[in-house]
Amino acid sequence: MDRILLEILACPICKGKLVYSQDEQELICRFDKLAYPIHDGIPVMLPDSTRPLIER
């Protein structure tokens, strides 16, 4: 994931910062506890495409 792109992108729901998960190929919003998928290097930032994070 391009570092500059990561600095520009924000959670579309809360407008908060996103964290890149290289293992899962997702962008994580820690505030909303949601993960946005990355397909073929393109972040899918649609709220309907998220998956909830499960706390362990």
Swiss-Prot record:
It holds the Pfam family Trm112p. GO terms for cellular component: cytosol. Coiled coil: none annotated. It comes from the Bacteria. Belongs to the UPF0434 family. This is UPF0434 protein CBUD_1597.1. It comes from Coxiella burnetii (strain Dugway 5J108-111). The lineage of its organism: Bacteria, Pseudomonadati, Pseudomonadota, Gammaproteobacteria, Legionellales.
